[in-house]
């Protein structure tokens, strides 16, 4: 969860924790679940403030973080610290080693929307990865996601969705825009 939930609901972290425990016990009485409140920077890098545009659970003890280190290194550090404090090994996507926003106009225009790759849809062993319509960048995102899942020993197929998602990804409050593939499913 993003700590944006605290502001939107005018609740303190302690108040939220109390509510969460009661809600969880009421709905799933014989199980337990721990949550992580991720800091939301509230900027253009994740305008919606949903965790599925920031991080992806890969497997027990491992998560995949979007390319915040490319966008906002200090915020990436805060996210990693919060996740590592909860015992997660953090893998990260990164595109700056491969693309230069100062030299590449297409990449520069899409740079703030690269978070969309983490917002892929998982259906059992199939990962459906959104695309931004820039083939080199789209391929690099798919490659990195494959590497992380393979490294984790998870056998899955990664499918790039052959559809330019940028009209959906780019925030448009008038038309309820923003989000990516995973967001569209709920």
Predicted ranges, named:
Residues 1-186:
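Histidine/cysteine-enriched polar flanking segments
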């Amino acid at each position: 969860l993003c700590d944006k939930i605290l502001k939107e609901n005018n609740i303190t972290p302690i108040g939220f924790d109390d509510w969460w425990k009661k809600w969880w016990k009421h709905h799933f009485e014989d199980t337990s679940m721990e949550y992580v409140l991720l800091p939301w920077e509230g900027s253009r890098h994740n305008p919606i403030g949903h965790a599925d545009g920031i991080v992806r659970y890969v497997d027990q003890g491992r998560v995949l973080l979007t390319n915040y280190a490319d966008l906002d290194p200090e915020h990436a550090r805060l996210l990693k610290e919060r996740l590592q404090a909860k015992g997660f090994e953090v893998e990260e996507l990164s595109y700056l080693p491969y693309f230069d926003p100062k030299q590449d106009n297409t990449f520069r225009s899409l740079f703030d929307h690269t978070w969309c790759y983490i917002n892929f849809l998982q259906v059992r062993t199939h990962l459906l990865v959104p695309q931004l319509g820039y083939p080199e960048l789209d391929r690099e995102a798919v490659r990195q996601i494959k590497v992380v899942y393979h490294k984790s020993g998870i056998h899955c197929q990664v499918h790039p969705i052959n559809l330019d998602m940028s009209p959906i990804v780019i925030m448009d409050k008038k038309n309820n825009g923003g989000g990516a593939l995973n967001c569209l499913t709920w």
